[in-house]
Amino acid sequence: MDTARVYLSLKPSKTAAGAQCVSPPSLPPDACRCPRSHRLALKLSCAGLILLVLALVGMSILVRVLVQKPSVEPCRVLIQENLSKTGSPAKLKCPKDWLSHRDKCFHVSQTSITWKESLADCGGKGATLLLVQDQEELRFLRNLTKRISSSFWIGLSYTLSDENWKWINGSTLNSDVLSITGDTEKDSCASVSQDKVLSESCDSDNIWVCQKELKCECMCNDS
């Protein structure tokens, strides 16, 4: 009886080998890359778009400021022309019972109250207690109140925390403008007499002077 011979092929078939070794097809190296010129154009477009947005934002802010800001400069020119022609600041318009001097309006009280009460009164008038600008303004107000024997309150008080005299707008007193006479204590406020600027108790009673800026519409509405 012949013995059957069985031969096993150890060589893998091409089909099997292909199934194991074949990898998915790859794309060409430059398939996902834009040409350099296209990328440069894209970057320039993005930069231009950003600049355009910033320009639009800036223009909108500028327009808003210009709309909200009153036209002050033409009014100042009219004020100066009025002063040069008439030589009288009284021609400048202020509210009724207020007096004008340079670019301010002043109101002198007829009664005497404490410093805090005078501060509140001026605030109720849409004004502030007097902020002395310079010696010339101080002389004007002293002449204005010469007939009144009482001193008058100004918007200046002593702050204990800073150990300094400060105006109600937060600025520190300049000794070249005013020199305070008297002791400075916890509750000290400044009043002006005919020859001195005094430190006295804020609870004392004095007349007071309110001030407000001369409004441009006072001049601009007249033509």
Swiss-Prot record:
Pfam families hit by this protein: Lectin_C
Signal peptide: none
Residue ranges, Extracellular side: 64-223
Molecular function, one GO term: carbohydrate binding
Keyword annotations: Disulfide bond, Lectin, Membrane, Receptor, Signal-anchor, Transmembrane, Transmembrane helix
Note: Ligand binding may be calcium dependent.
Its job: Plays a stimulatory role on natural killer (NK) cell cytotoxicity.
Protein's name according to its UniProt entry: Killer cell lectin-like receptor subfamily B member 1A
